[in-house]
Amino acid sequence: YGELLNRQNKILGNMLGAEIDFLIKGIDNKSRSVAASRKDAMLKKRQIFYLPDANGTSRVCEGRIVQARVIAVAEKTVRTEIFGVEYSIPARDLSYDWMGDATENYHVGDQILVRITSVSISSVTDISVKADVKSVLGNTSVENLQKCKVQGKYIGTITDIHKGTVFIRLNIGVNAIAHSCYDSRLPGKKDEVSFVVTRIDSERNVAVGLISRIVKQNI
């Protein structure tokens, strides 16, 4: 029970500042307080937006762009509420641009546009939904990649490091990959680096090259 309570407190802590709906279940005039249910409000919203109307159509369906509320944010995910259904959007679905930390771009209480990619309905209490943000924002990487020249030197920020491969977001709006670093210091996440392009990978829309030096370490 203690573990469950800790988990619930953690979830509530992460949701501080979130905008939520609730149905009032009771009022105590003496203590000037109300008892309310978020769960009931979410079920009501699900009935309105997900279940088919008299014409057999649903307001929230695959392919539709809708507004979602941001209710929690972590480094690699943004938790949203989409008309009574919660869904955590992974960083890879937030933007075509490589993102090191979602908390720098998204905040609890934000309202964002998402595209519904799938809806699964078994009953009003059992609805799951998937959505992304990047298809709404569009992809500028292809256009920006044309600004890159082989042997060109650009400044960027390290978004991630995985198995020796360094992922960089260049300031000119291009995703880049480096397999080697010529600075004596080890590169780290969020470091600002100078990147030299050795080739352009048009298929994957990335610049490939090396880190010539670390301009500013994220300490």
Where does each model-flagged region fall?
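Single-stranded RNA-binding regions, centering on S1/OB-family and related RNA-binding modules
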Residues: 1-219
